[in-house]
Amino acid sequence: MKTDTQIKFDTIVKEGFTPVLKPLSFKKKALNYYRRLAEVGHIINIQKSSYGDRDNIRFRINIGIFEPKFWSVSHTGQLPDYPTEPVCLIRKTINDLRGRKDLWYEIHNYTDEQKLIKEIQEDIQQYILPFFDQLDSVEKILLALEKDSN
């Protein structure tokens, strides 16, 4: 049986991420959202902390840019239908995008679900989606990688 905190976590994922991402063609699988574009894919991963427990859940948002040609060079086998964030060419956390240290969202018995849902939706709309918009083609990815290496 799930604890109140686990139920809150499920609600926060369902109401915080899905309503914003589904209309933008993101598909959900487990704690991952993936959107495939013509040349690249965008991934949002919800990573639970291994230090939490059933009554205190901590998680953060990881972001990835998946590029099929890069994946083919470094992996064998069929291209994944739902790639995961660790195999992405470019990987970031919400911390990187917000310019903060180690941000983990926390859920416990006293968490205000609606407040946390609002914060997550703002982070998606203000930081994650603009980041994805900057990296929606192979050309833009190559320019970003070149810029980061300088």
Regions found by a protein language model. Give the residues of each.
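Intrinsically disordered, low-complexity regulatory regions enriched in serine/threonine/proline
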Residues: 1-9, 28, 35-150
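Amphipathic alpha-helical segments
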Residues: 7-28
